[in-house]
């Protein structure tokens, strides 16, 4: 019947006649607009016919494609587009099925023009907001086909560019159509993301090629519009901007895999650009998820080449800085923990020369300079990320890093690697470098918060080590914490300026919190400065750091008491150079003389006591004329000019404690304290830091003032503590520790080797002994209550306690309530 109707036009259904009428006899004439208006009006009037109209148009289009009548194909697609734009009703879902079938047919074609035509129609469809979603519609084919078009390798460059841009636009259309509708196909599934994201990144990689082919500035705007790289970037930004919390991981993982597969971490330019796009596109509250993904990827690549790991770390650095402006969530300490773990692994790799801990035939050979570059990248990342954190988080990070520094003790045996280096030493250096990066620029008004006791104790313990590099790092870290007004660079060179006003120092009055800090920790700081000055392995950088530390303490934390103590400390350093009990080299002795001259010149001008300034100036002038080797201008230069004999230093070349005490005492300073020579307090830190000499060959005079009489203060004779008494006390304590360790070893050995019956018998005997002791104690302490009538005499004339129950006792009326 339908076949007969097809022969006679008047008997054909109206929708078919309307569809046939929109096609002209010559396809070059284009769509017949008047007939198209009739078809549109009919579709709007009878929406139930839309599915039949779509099916018939699809039938004609498939036939025209097969017969290579591409003009009619274009007309059919134009008609479909107009119907889609005009019709918004519940029946459009059935029409869309026919439409998508025709688009898929065009995309399957090998003709680039048909592929582009189908993509453009799909993009128009994607921009239409449907009233009712379709539960059964699938876009899997379109994701696969558009992704394939993004990787087009057509011989013609212009056609290849058009196909790639069509593929990107198609992916953009799929994202727009599905991403906001939970009832549609879930575009965030890994099977889709693994195709979409790499396709966009592939086109982003070729941005340099596209820009290099731009022939002239006049054509630049047109070329920019045709640039697949920029279109891919916009699509990627749109995709990531729509990502919810649970979809971030699926979107980021393909990026990491793509960078791995194409070895794009090593140049790190493209990887950094990708993650900048990601960090600026996603919602700020989701930034920490990206950081977590990068940290996990870094751990997964812990055995990759150092250049790959360095690229990941630098990308992590850029991403972390951006994330810190938004929200980094709970990943702050996690990030630092991962970086420090990678730092320790890198040290192990550099020492062993292999990722497996031992060199074998199948193991990769590690290049030490690449591991050093990776370590520097990690330290730089730690510093750059820490600089974005608020003060309270930065303090936590500082304490966290310091807790990871291995302190030298009997519990940390020396470990050697291929080069004979100490693994602990390298770890200490790297962690102290990281700590220095974090502390640089750290601003904290309260020094008690910036340098808490547990942190300061651990830090200063490392300051007593024999390793010169570690000592220098500790000094630099202390300087970074104390310098709160940016004065550090003004003391980078040691000199005896006649007028320090040219330095333009920023000086504030010492706050109450700073005073409390110095009362608690000043002697500890002075002691470490004093001992650091006596190290014979010091070089010019050490003395510059010591000078900077002394100067910054004087500016940031000094009151009158601190000034007096610092002067005593520097005069004690001068005595070290003069007496030379440590047998220091000539350079070190001259450097100590020069250090003392530079600091006393500075502090005299800060105190503005004329007589003090005059004395310091006179000594400096005398040295300039007769002993320039005792001034920083001759010592701290590339080629120091030193004296061959320092044993005959005359008193005119020295700063005299009696003279300084006299002139400062007249200005209100504590002259009695100034007269006392500085003597460092000895602690157990020397033993913990493995120093060669634990005790110093000095005598400590300890004066104890009696506080019993408020009317009169009496002084008891000073107890003389000599080197021998100190040595005996330390040796005795060491012997006690050895005995305790031996006892513990015997107990452990007994429980490991003795039979169970013997151990059980021993424990049972101890339990019975304990019970008997308890019974004796109870007999002594628990007695019957005393008798109110006193004692009575028993037989043999012995007094006997007679106990009366409490409820039978007779109490006076006044005692009864």
From Swiss-Prot:
Q: Which GO terms describe its cellular component?
A: actin cytoskeleton; cytosol; plasma membrane
- Classify the protein's membrane topology as the record does: Lipid-anchor
Please name the InterPro entries in this protein's record.
ARM-like, ARM-type_fold, EFR3-like_ARM, EFR3_Homologs
Q: Which residues carry this modification: Phosphoserine?
A: 212, 214, 216
Q: Which SUPFAM superfamilies match?
A: ARM repeat
The alphabetical list of record keywords is:
Cell membrane, Cytoplasm, Lipoprotein, Membrane, Palmitate, Phosphoprotein
Q: Where does the UniProt annotation locate this protein? A: Cell membrane; Cytoplasm, Cytosol
What does the entry state regarding organ or tissue expression? Widely expressed.
Q: In what way is this protein post-translationally modified?
A: Palmitoylated at its N-terminus, anchoring the protein to the plasma membrane.
Write out the GO biological process terms: phosphatidylinositol phosphate biosynthetic process; protein localization to plasma membrane; social behavior; transmission of nerve impulse
Predominant location of this chain?
membrane
Q: How does it assemble?
A: Component of a phosphatidylinositol 4-kinase (PI4K) complex, composed of PI4KA, EFR3 (EFR3A or EFR3B), TTC7 (TTC7A or TTC7B) and HYCC (HYCC1 or HYCC2).
Annotated function = Component of a complex required to localize phosphatidylinositol 4-kinase (PI4K) to the plasma membrane. The complex acts as a regulator of phosphatidylinositol 4-phosphate (PtdIns(4)P) synthesis. In the complex, EFR3B probably acts as the membrane-anchoring component. Also involved in responsiveness to G-protein-coupled receptors; it is however unclear whether this role is direct or indirect.
Q: Which PANTHER family match?
A: PROTEIN EFR3 HOMOLOG B (PTHR12444:SF4), PROTEIN EFR3 HOMOLOG CMP44E (PTHR12444)
Give the UniProt family note: Belongs to the EFR3 family.
Q: What is this protein called in UniProt?
A: Protein EFR3 homolog B
